[in-house]
């Protein structure tokens, strides 16, 4: 899990729910929320203010370019890569070969790319988990559970050598 002094990136941060939660967990660390969409950046800044999170820096732009001058991360969440996943992973591992990475995927293409990256980057620890939610909906006098699209959560890290 996150430590209080973690240095985190939230890449594809959207409106910042993950970044804000990371910042609350890493009380004495820092979180960099990277987002390319202007509308999401504005909402992210509003959410940061609403939750009074001071250890969070909003970075407007696309990874990996906007991350090059940031400090080396200990933990990274990738919620979106804008098609730059391999370049992002290369940049992260160059900064810290032992960084813990969590990434989500919903499309078959993203799932395939993350699965290939788990192998190609030779992570010593790698796992994929599928999570699915079902919502109840009325169908006549019955209630049926309608499955939502599954989300795949990938975790990747290489062990430090003693």
Segments from the language model and where they lie:
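Conserved class I S-adenosyl-L-methionine
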Residues: 5-14
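Short beta->alpha hinge that forms the Motif I/post-I loop of the SAM-binding pocket
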Residues: 35-40, 80-81, 106
């Amino acid at each position: 899990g996150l430590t209080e002094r973690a240095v985190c990136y939230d890449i594809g941060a959207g409106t910042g729910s993950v970044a804000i939660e990371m910042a609350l967990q890493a009380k004495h660390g820092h979180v960099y929320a990277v987002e390319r969409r202007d509308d999401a950046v504005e909402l992210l800044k509003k959410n940061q203010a609403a939750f009074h999170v001071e250890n969070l820096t909003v970075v407007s732009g696309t990874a990996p370019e906007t991350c090059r001058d940031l400090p080396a991360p200990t933990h990274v969440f990738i919620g979106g890569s804008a098609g730059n996943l391999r370049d992002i992973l290369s940049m992260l591992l160059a900064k810290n070969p032992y960084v813990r990475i969590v990434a989500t995927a919903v499309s078959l293409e993203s799932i395939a790319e993350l699965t290939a990256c788990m192998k190609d980057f030779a992570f010593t620890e790698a796992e994929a988990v599928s999570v699915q939610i079902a919502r109840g909906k009325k169908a006549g006098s019955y209630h049926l559970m309608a499955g939502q699209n599954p989300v795949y959560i990938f975790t990747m890290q290489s062990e430090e050598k003693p």
